[in-house]
């Protein structure tokens, strides 16, 4: 919708304070030069009948009417920028690996000199061994070229590595918006807390109980009334079932859409994402028993 590849059925799209929902003609062409996308599947997003030079050079011809010699030079520069030899410009997509194809897709997205780059799950279709390389490339390009990037992803590691601000969505609605550190270290919304707590821990022997979500994911085409998360939320009330929460803006521009976020987070540190583990509760019980009795209970008590 942001790139106008699909028309919005409702709502409005704003870019730099300007509504672009119905942009057309010359303005739409300008927007498509400024807004580019890295598609999710590098095996489907490149035309198998076109060479790399044609794929990367097409935006240069469409948006800048660049002559062939100049296009060839610019394509060589772009390939070097994404870590590919310029000599590969005459090859076809089937001659490359998935990671190399995604680099070609990134070079094509950069060709028009965009101001904003949208990454639609840019590494999810790649092998894990290649994902880190592409993520590091995008991070480097962001700083090198001064790009604004919008990354759509479900991988928490990718989000934490690449993001400055994070919007957490559930059934098509933003439930929390905050800096990356706030989201990962001190989530406020129950869904965000469950999401972060679900990440595997890399500390052997350390127990961490995630708040389990009950029920199945509702049909996005027919979302529940009130708060869309209420069918799975452990803190649900009648208000949650009936009244849709608004985004409450907190200090620093942080936003959370939850009726009970203050109550939920009042009596505990929001940095502690999961409830205390069973092992922790057992140790605390032993400590409290020792404080009031002369001897500790046995292991079988």
Label the model's feature ranges.
Residues 11-19:
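Conserved ABC transporter NBD signature motif
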Residues 4, 115-208:
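P-loop NTP-binding/switch modules centered on Walker-like glycine-rich loops
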Residues 177-287:
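Short catalytic/signature loops enriched in Gly
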Residues 19, 69-87, 196-197:
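Conserved ABC ATPase "signature" region
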Residues 92-96, 100:
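Conserved ABC ATPase signature
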Residues 20-36, 54, 62, 68, ...:
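ABC ATPase NBD coupling module
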């Amino acid at each position: 919708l942001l790139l106008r590849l699909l028309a919005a059925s409702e709502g409005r799209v704003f870019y730099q304070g300007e509504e672009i929902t119905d942009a057309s003609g010359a303005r739409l062409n300008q927007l498509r030069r400024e807004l580019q996308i890295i598609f999710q599947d590098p095996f489907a997003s490149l035309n198998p009948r076109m060479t790399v030079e044609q794929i990367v050079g097409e935006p240069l011809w469409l948006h800048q009417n660049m002559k062939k010699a100049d296009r060839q030079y610019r394509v060589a520069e772009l390939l070097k920028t994404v870590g590919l030899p310029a000599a590969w410009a005459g090859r076809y997509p089937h001659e490359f690996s998935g990671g190399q194809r995604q680099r070609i897709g990134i070079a094509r997205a950069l060709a028009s000199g965009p101001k904003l780059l949208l990454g639609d799950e840019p590494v999810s279709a790649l092998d894990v061994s290649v994902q880190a390389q592409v993520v590091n490339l995008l991070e480097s390009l962001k700083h090198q070229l001064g790009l604004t990037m919008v990354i759509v992803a479900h991988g928490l590691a990718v989000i934490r590595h690449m993001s400055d601000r994070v919007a957490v969505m559930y059934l098509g609605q933003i439930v929390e918006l905050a800096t990356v550190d706030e989201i990962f270290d001190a989530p406020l919304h129950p869904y965000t807390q469950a999401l972060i707590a679900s990440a595997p821990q890399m500390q052997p022997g350390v127990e961490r109980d995630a708040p389990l979500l009950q029920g199945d994911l509702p049909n996005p085409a027919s979302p529940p009334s009130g708060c869309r998360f209420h069918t799975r939320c452990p803190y649900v009330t009648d208000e949650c079932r009936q009244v849709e929460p608004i985004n409450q803006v907190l200090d620093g521009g942080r936003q959370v859409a939850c009726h009970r976020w203050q109550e939920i987070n009042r009596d505990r540190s929001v940095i502690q994402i999961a409830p205390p583990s069973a092992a922790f509760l057992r140790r605390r019980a032993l400590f409290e028993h020792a404080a009031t009795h002369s001897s500790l209970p046995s292991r079988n008590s």
